[in-house]
Design a protein with these regions (language model features):
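PLP-dependent amino-acid enzyme catalytic core
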Residues: 1-198
Length: 198
């Protein structure tokens, strides 16, 4: 089954939606294509002509691809609040005084044990928004500090990951202009995780 053939059964990942996400990310001044690494020995071992792996360690200087989903979800949320399509909002527009006047400022909440939270913090900072990141018991101080460097308020809680998700969601619900940006879905919370996947 080719990607082209699979697209009709993947409406959440349509070509149009993928192109919107790509255009959005390309609008960031920090954007650059990440390299492909050719793995000749793996290709030979698997009996393939070629085998490539996308090296996302260069993505926005964060050493992970996770920033792509969180930032795109945040942009979609802002676009929806402004009754616009995300394709109308480039990085320059999202960081403009006009947008700040029309939208104001949100606080994006998430739970993480690493890269997703760092990506949300980075994107919120770049877009002039706030972020709060809860980390589960056992998270390293180094990961916490890396997220704090991106401008987030970060705490390591004395609970597991799932409980951190519940706590972050409750905090978002109780905070004026609070928004949960989580990379897991549950009943009644599917829109933002869908944007993250796109």
């Amino acid at each position: 089954l080719s990607l082209h053939d699979a697209l009709p059964i993947l409406p959440l990942m349509s070509k149009e939606k993928i192109e919107k996400a790509l255009a959005f990310h390309k609008s960031f001044p920090q954007y650059s294509e990440t390299p492909l690494a050719e793995l000749n020995h793996m290709a030979a071992y698997l009996g393939l002509n070629d085998f490539f792996v996308k090296d996302e360690s260069y993505r926005f200087g964060l050493n992970a691809f996770k920033v792509l989903g969180g930032s795109f979800a945040m942009a979609n949320y802002i676009a929806e609040k402004l009754k616009k399509d995300v394709s109308e909002l480039t990085y320059d527009e999202l960081t403009s005084d006009q947008l700040r006047s029309a939208f104001g400022q949100a606080t994006f909440f998430t739970a993480t044990d690493g890269n997703h939270g760092r990506g949300v913090a980075w994107a919120a900072n770049k877009l002039g928004q706030k972020s709060v990141v809860l980390m589960p018991k056992g998270s390293t101080q180094t990961r916490k500090e890396n997220i704090e460097k991106e401008g987030a308020t970060v705490t390591i809680e004395e609970v597991n990951y799932d409980e951190c998700v519940r706590m972050a969601n409750k905090m978002a619900e109780e905070t004026e202009n609070g928004v949960m940006v989580q990379d897991t879905a549950w009943d009644g919370y599917e829109k933002i995780p869908t944007w993250i996947m796109q």
